Amino acid sequence: MLLRRPEARRAVRRWRSGFLVALALALFGLAAQAAEADSAAVPDTIKQRLTACTACHGEQGRATNDGYYPRIAGKPAGYLYNQLHNFREGRRQYPMMTYLVDHLSDAYLQEIAAYFADQHPPYPPPQPHDPSEATRARGDLLVNKGDAGKQIPACIACHGSAMTGVQPATPGLLGLPRDYLVSQIGAWKNGARHALAPDCMAQVAQRLSAEDIGAVASWLAAQPVQAGATAVAPGSVKLPLACGSVPALN
């Protein structure tokens, strides 16, 4: 029996509607299955979530000594938390970092900091660099003795005698690229980088000349890091300046 034209059109529309509904349900089912498969294949762990960090900072946060991105593995958790917080609050400026942490809670920043603080991959050998003897000597002086005439305390006075940092919030400065060190000390000197007040690093950086900054960075970048080097215990050093980023010990 042949359908009249209006009835045929209605039948076609009903068939088309049913087909589209069936197709949509099928596609939804496939998408759900794919999502379940992806969820099963990628475990929801802190390590997996932090691939956004290790993409730049390297596996476990180890970085390298010949790139711009710093090593964050093994740094004191308090220091790492302070830096993440500073990026979120605008005291440090780097668009990619700000984008990553802009909407993260304090608790999650602390979780990230704790994860990387607990990573201890080996350090690479120092990067090749050949400063002049005068530059090397000036860097050695500033790191280990400071410059009383310019009211510059020795780096070891805050960062520890082995320059491996002090718990809970002072970082070690060895194993970092020279260019990174120059850029960060320079950022404090020109006001682009800030820490919690009183900002002791800003005070020190203001007293350093460009040549001083280059000398310190060259000396630090040339030092090997001993296996098992870690930040020393709280209270191991008496700070020569008040630092808002370092909690006072009772």
Where are these regions (language model features)?
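Extended intrinsically disordered, low-complexity coil regions enriched in Ser, Thr, Gly, Ala
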Residues: P76-T98, G175-G186, N190-D199
